[in-house]
């Protein structure tokens, strides 16, 4: 099992800074979601971060390779993204494990892969972006109930707090009935290898997704660009 990202300074996720490229997305109420009920973006096979704390690097790397804008040639590997993110994140030095989603997407923007990024502070706002624009990179609390996937393909933010973790949210289905009775789910692409969950993926109810983001989570809604050296890949 891969190590979780443990954030410096007590394990809390950093406050979003909307002074650079990042700004707040307009909030979307659950009733304001688009008529489109389902979207699942194509993504590469799940990576495995091993025993490292490089989930931000892996999540951001998988974002680059996922549709709708798929940068697949000469892109920075997960460890390069992680190392560069540590240099520009909220904490001094680099002698610690982990970094922030903010630093990861900020590095991708500096490299020209992202034209802008905005922050979603709740589940419906993030889901709206997933349904209409692209996957979302999140950094959220991770509990015992999220360590393994049940028979229905779901994880649950219950039990003892383990730490913080970054994953890529590649899909949303506003009409799926979840095992806990809630309606609506999102699909996460983890970086614990293809043997975890459903080929490295798991589902989370939209209710739980909303609670995780509101609990001081990071949800980066990005607007990607295709690097000049890239040949477009049909999604």
Stretches with model-predicted labels:
Residues 1-235:
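Catalytic-core signature of thiol
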């Amino acid at each position: 099992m891969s190590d979780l990202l443990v954030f410096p300074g007590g394990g809390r996720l950093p406050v979003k800074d909307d002074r650079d490229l990042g700004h707040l997305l307009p909030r979307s109420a659950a009733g304001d979601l688009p008529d489109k009920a389902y979207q699942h973006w194509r993504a590469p096979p799940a990576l495995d971060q091993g025993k490292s704390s490089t989930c931000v690097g892996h999540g951001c790397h998988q974002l680059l390779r996922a549709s709708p804008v798929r940068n697949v040639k000469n892109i920075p590997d997960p460890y390069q993204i992680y190392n560069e993110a540590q240099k520009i994140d909220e904490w001094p030095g680099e002698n610690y494990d982990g970094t922030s989603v903010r630093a990861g997407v900020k590095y991708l923007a500096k490299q020209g892969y992202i034209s802008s990024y905005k922050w979603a502070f709740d589940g419906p706002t993030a889901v709206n972006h997933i349904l209409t624009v692209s996957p979302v990179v999140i950094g959220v609390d991770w509990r015992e109930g999220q360590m393994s996937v049940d028979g229905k393909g779901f994880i649950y933010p219950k039990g003892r707090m383990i730490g913080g973790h970054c994953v890529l949210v590649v899909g949303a289905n506003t009409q799926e009935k979840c095992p806990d009775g809630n309606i609506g789910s999102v699909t996460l692409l983890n970086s614990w290898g293809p043997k975890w969950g459903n080929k490295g993926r798991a589902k989370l109810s939209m209710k739980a997704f909303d609670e995780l983001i509101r609990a001081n989570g990071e949800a980066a809604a990005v607007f990607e660009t295709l690097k000049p050296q890239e040949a477009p890949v049909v999604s």
